[in-house]
C-alpha cells in the first residue's frame, strides 16, 4: 500500500518542492494550502490531492483531516509567514498574522493529524535558525519559531513511546520566492538540501530531534 504524506503550505516555494520530492519517493501526498498549487503537482492525479485549507482556522483544519480520513505516514508542517522589521514598527495585525499561522496554525494541524498517526509515522517541523537564535528585526517571527522549537521538542518526547518520530529542521536562508530580493541569493540554501534532509530522516532508523542547516551567508552572524 502506498504511504501517505501531508504537507502544509504546498502552493509554492519550499512546500511545493517537499510535496514533489515525496511524490517522487513514492508517497501519495495531500497538500494543504489556501491557494491552489501550480500545475506541476497535478501532473499525476493518482499521486497528489490538494485540500483547500486555511490552517489558522481550527475548524477548517479539523474538516480537512476528516475529509482525508486516512492514516498518515509523514506530516510536514511547512506553512508559515515572515515579516521583517523592528518590533516598534510592527502592527497588531502583523502580530496576529504571524502567531496565528506559524504557531496556532501549526498546532491545529498537528492536533488534527495526531489521531491519524501511528507507530512508524514521522512529523516534521520546518522551523528556522530564528527558532534557535535571537535575530535583530525578526522579533515576532523569531518568537513564533522559538515556540515551535519548544513545541516540537516536547511533542517528540510525548510521542516517543508511541513509535512516532518528531524532527525540527532549522534552515538558514533558503532560495525560495520569499528571498527574490536578497542580494546574496546565490549563496542561499538550495531547497534540495531540505528535501534531502527529510528523505534522509525517513530512511534512517535514528531519531533526529533538531537539525540545523546553514547556508554560506547568514544574516544573523
Roles of regions detected by a PLM:
Residues 115, 157-161:
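Alpha-helical segment proximal to the catalytic Tyr-Lys
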Residues 11, 19:
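N-terminal Rossmann NAD(P)H-binding glycine-rich loop of SDR-like oxidoreductase domains
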Residues 168, 183-221:
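C-terminal helical subdomain
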Residues 128:
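Residue(s) in the substrate-gating loop at a strand-loop-helix junction
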Residues 110, 144:
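Active-site helix of classical SDR
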Residues 78-83:
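Conserved NAD(P)H cofactor-binding loop of Rossmann-fold oxidoreductase domains
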Residues 86-87, 94-99:
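Substrate-binding pocket helix/loop in short-chain dehydrogenase/reductase
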Amino acid at each position: 500500500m502506498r504511504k501517505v504524506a501531508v504537507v502544509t503550505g504546498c502552493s509554492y516555494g519550499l512546500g511545493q518542492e517537499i510535496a514533489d520530492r515525496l511524490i517522487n519517493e513514492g508517497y501519495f501526498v495531500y497538500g494543504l494550502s489556501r491557494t491552489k498549487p501550480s500545475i506541476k503537482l497535478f501532473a499525476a492525479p493518482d499521486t497528489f490531492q490538494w485540500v483547500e485549507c486555511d490552517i489558522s482556522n481550527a475548524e477548517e483544519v479539523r474538516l480537512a483531516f476528516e475529509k482525508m480520513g486516512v492514516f498518515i505516514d509523514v506530516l510536514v508542517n511547512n506553512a508559515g509567514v515572515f515579516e521583517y522589521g523592528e518590533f516598534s514598527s510592527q502592527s497588531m495585525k502583523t502580530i496576529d498574522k504571524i502567531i496565528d499561522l506559524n504557531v496556532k496554525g501549526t498546532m491545529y494541524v498537528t492536533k488534527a493529524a495526531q489521531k491519524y498517526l501511528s507507530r512508524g509515522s514521522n512529523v516534521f517541523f520546518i522551523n528556522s535558525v530564528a527558532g534557535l537564535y535571537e535575530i535583530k528585526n525578526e522579533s515576532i517571527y523569531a518568537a513564533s519559531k522559538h515556540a515551535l522549537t519548544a513545541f516540537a521538542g516536547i511533542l517528540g518526547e510525548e510521542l516517543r513511546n508511541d513509535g512516532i518520530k518528531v524532527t525540527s529542521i532549522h534552515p538558514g536562508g533558503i532560495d525560495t520566492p520569499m528571498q527574490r530580493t536578497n542580494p546574496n541569493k546565490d549563496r542561499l540554501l538550495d531547497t534540495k538540501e531540505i528535501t534531502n534532509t527529510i528523505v534522509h530522516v525517513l530512511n534512517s532508523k535514528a531519531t533526529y530531534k533538531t537539525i540545523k542547516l546553514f547556508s554560506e551567508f547568514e544574516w544573523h552572524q
